[in-house]
Swiss-Prot record:
It comes from the Bacteria. This is HPr kinase/phosphorylase. Mg(2+) binds at residues 160, 202. The lineage of its organism: Bacteria, Bacillati, Bacillota, Bacilli, Bacillales. The Walker A ATP-binding motif also binds Pi and PPi. It comes from Geobacillus thermodenitrificans (strain NG80-2). The gene is hprK. PANTHER family: HPR KINASE_PHOSPHORYLASE (PTHR30305:SF1), PROTEIN YJDM-RELATED (PTHR30305). Its EC number is 2.7.11.-, 2.7.4.-. Both phosphorylation and phosphorolysis are carried out by the same active site and suggest a common mechanism for both reactions.
Length: 309
């Protein structure tokens, strides 16, 4: 799992570090946040100390009603050796008892001018993106008519050449050769290129070319949701290929199954056009239009009419 540290949160959201600077390299292992309201009342039985703690106006206004002894006790229990950080929102004053306890336990205390709800939402989205399960797939990812198409297949089958032709036809390259994929949701896979090979495409005989330099910024994308997998394979005359499109193959990446099409490759086939049509047909299916099923229904009706005659 990728590591996120408190220091990354400070830099990403431009937080003010108030105290506990020694702990800014503590790891953040979950995207869940905690607003320790009931803990301020003294109930720590289920205190999620491993989460980022977020203190807003509600928590701090209740905190001000406590006695000095209770204030010190609450903050000492709030700051543990596994707490990645405590953030005070709305630019509110940080209680001196919190500063004292955080320095003792090296728990970073930060302050943000954002409203609590907005800060919570942005933190959650950022952490879910950074802590999402990841994998890498050998292939090419292209944005075709707004559909993220992952082109797979053995080396030399023509994946990069197909991507080059697609870019020339106005589509956008996301990644070539190695596609880093992260699962951001129960049904969402996001693909991107490793930083080392971003915007680069390898063509046998030409070498490595920079697609952004060659075709402009509109020819590339930093990341794209993957919706369709197209597997290119050399034409096997002994194999029966799907000619109707009624049976839908699936490919599982991480915990998500994606629709997959197997396209046989042989000289004379325009793969770029086939990929374009596959992407458009995929969009039509999502809109409820399935040409294969319509043909099958018409064929069944024709057979029934013939039998009656």
């Amino acid at each position: 799992m990728p590591k996120v540290r408190t220091k990354d949160i400070i830099e990403q959201f431009q937080l003010e570090l108030v105290s506990g600077a020694e702990g800014i390299y503590r790891p953040i292992t979950t995207s869940d946040l905690s607003r320790p309201g009931i803990e301020m009342a003294g109930y720590f039985a289920y205190y999620p100390a491993e989460r980022l703690q977020l203190l807003g106006r509600t928590e701090l206004s209740f905190y001000e009603t406590l006695t000095p002894e209770e204030k010190r006790a609450r903050m000492q229990r709030l700051c543990t050796d596994i707490t990645p950080g405590i953030i005070v929102s709305r630019g509110l004053d940080v209680p001196p008892e919190l500063i004292e306890a955080s320095e003792r336990q090296s728990v970073p205390v930060m302050r943000s001018t954002m409203k609590t709800t907005r800060l919570s939402s942005r933190l959650t989205n950022y952490l879910e993106s950074k802590l999402a399960p990841t994998t890498a797939v050998h292939g090419v990812l292209v944005d075709v008519y707004g559909v993220g198409v992952l082109i797979t297949g053995k080396s030399g089958v023509g994946k990069s050449e197909t991507a080059l032709e697609l870019v020339k036809r106005g589509h956008r390259l996301v990644a070539d050769d190695c596609v880093e994929i992260r699962q951001e949701d129960e049904d969402t896979l996001i693909g991107s290129a490793p930083e080392l090979i971003e915007h680069l495409l390898e063509i046998r005989g030409l070498g490595i070319i920079n697609m952004m330099t060659l075709f402009g910024a509109g020819a590339v994308l930093p990341h794209k949701r993957i919706s369709l997998v197209i597997d290119l394979e050399l034409w096997d005359p002994e194999k029966q290929y799907d000619r109707l499109g009624l049976e839908e193959e699936k490919m599982k990446i991480l915990d998500i199954e994606l629709p997959r099409l197997t396209i046989p490759v042989r000289p004379g086939r325009n793969l770029a056009v086939i990929v374009e049509v596959a992407a458009m047909n995929f969009r039509l299916k999502r809109m409820g239009v399935n040409a294969a099923e319509e043909f099958s229904a018409r064929l069944s009706d024709a057979i029934e009419e013939g039998e009656r005659d």
